[in-house]
Curated annotation (Swiss-Prot):
It comes from Pseudoalteromonas atlantica (strain T6c / ATCC BAA-1087). HAMAP family: HisF (MF_01013). Heterodimer of HisH and HisF. One of its GO terms (molecular function) is imidazoleglycerol-phosphate synthase activity. It is found in: Cytoplasm. This is Imidazole glycerol phosphate synthase subunit HisF. One of its GO terms (biological process) is L-histidine biosynthetic process.
Length: 257
């Protein structure tokens, strides 16, 4: 396998980076561009930006900051938020983004994945999946419009089935957002990620739960994911990226310089 990726995630709302817990009660973290610049300088392998209310507000991602990001960082970055068409995606890629990610729009129109794949290439197309474990049913269920807690909806899809479906439509990468773990820093959902890995032939990125350096080691070694996405541990300075990468190298995890 290629070297594993460390990916800071920046949730954007009203032009600022915010962070919630289990997709709720978001607090403001800071300005977008300085944070992006900082993470790039610290050695992040790539960045992901989610305009978290774009889909629920029925609008496309606020593009005013995309060009500014492209001007100040030299690592790949992915942008998500309300992208409903090839035209929407094209504008964001033209502004300098390397990838676009779709989540709720893919659930509304799965053929959009194939359209993006055919237009821009599979490497550009990321599908984000917000997965919640329902203790009553014992099943992982896909949710949508999760950026606005008042509008979040459960879908008809069980997570494993949707993972298979998006691959058939041409997804180039999957980010699995484990909602139960989001922001609580108790570790990634290894059980779910391991099960999904068995049916995921494209790069799989784990999201939700990082709290300690060992959590990154565990998710790479036990769930065999290609990358680990995290937010609060980086935003709050709990785990400096250079320190994390040094630790992973000591643990014999293949990591990028």
């Amino acid at each position: 396998m290629l070297a594993r990726r460390i990916i800071p995630c920046l949730d954007v709302r009203d032009g600022l980076v915010v962070k919630g817990v289990k997709f709720r009660n978001h607090e403001t973290i800071g300005e977008i561009v300085p944070l992006a610049e900082l993470y790039a300088q610290q050695g992040a392998d790539e960045l992901v930006f989610y305009d978290i209310t774009a889909s629920s507000d029925q609008r496309v991602v606020d593009k005013s900051w995309v060009t500014r990001i492209a001007q100040v960082i030299d690592i790949p970055f992915c942008v998500a938020g309300g992208i409903k068409s090839v035209e929407d995606a094209g504008r964001i890629l033209e502004m300098g983004a390397d990838k676009i990610s779709i989540n709720s729009p893919a659930l509304a129109n799965p053929s959009l994945i194939r359209e993006l794949h055919d237009t821009f290439g599979q490497q550009c197309v990321v599908v984000g999946i917000d997965s919640y474990f329902n203790e009553e049913t014992g099943k992982y269920q896909v949710h949508q419009y999760t950026g606005d807690e008042s509008r979040t909806q459960i879908t008809r899809w069980q997570t494993a089935d949707w993972v298979k479906e998006v691959q058939q439509h041409g997804a180039g990468e999957i980010v699995l957002n484990c909602m139960n773990q989001d922001g609580v820093r108790q570790g990634y959902d290894i059980t779910q990620l391991t099960a999904i890995r068995e049916n995921c032939a494209v790069p799989l990125i784990a999201s939700g739960g990082a709290g300690e350096k060992v959590h990154f080691k565990d998710v790479f070694e036990q769930a065999d994911v290609d990358g680990a996405l995290a937010a609060s541990v980086f935003h709050k300075g709990i785990i400096p990226i250079p320190e994390l990468k040094a630790y992973l190298r000591e643990q014999q995890v293949a990591i990028r310089d």
